[in-house]
């Protein structure tokens, strides 16, 4: 098994605390509403949303995968940090054991925030992660972020 680490950052004009509430804590409800072209539904399979919770994320037609199952690994309300692992479905299978993801939302001096994202692809055997997988994951994250950001800008009273 190998581990391929990929780090990226994305900026937002939304303050860190507000973005954490919307994007992380209520993303299960918000994503299908604001980005139905990316996520059709999120279903809680097991748990209460904290560490150990298993969620099934279903994708609409046009996305190469029908679903993924993810496990919440950490929710840090103080430091705006969220960790989860994709453990089934999607790209996980013959070549990938799991994908561990960590998102940390950091406040910026101008009142916005930076999302620091660390993805660890745990491969099976000597398989390598394809550049297309990383690109697709980054594009999905960017789509969700911009959709949530647009929603929050249009609804100034939401998630305060």
Swiss-Prot record:
Cellular component, GO annotation: cytoplasm; nucleus
One Gene Ontology biological process: abscisic acid-activated signaling pathway
Protein name from the UniProt record: Major pollen allergen Bet v 1-E
SMART domains: Bet_v_1 (SM01037)
Location(s) in or outside the cell: Cytoplasm
Record: residues binding brassinolide: 55, 82, 84, 101
SUPFAM superfamilies tied to this protein: Bet v1-like (SSF55961)
Record-linked InterPro entries: Bet_v_I/MLP, Bet_v_I_allergen, Plant_def-hormone_signal, START-like_dom_sf
Molecular function, one GO term: abscisic acid binding
Keywords: Allergen, Cytoplasm, Pathogenesis-related protein, Plant defense
Native organism: Betula pendula (European white birch)
Function, in words: May be a general steroid carrier protein.
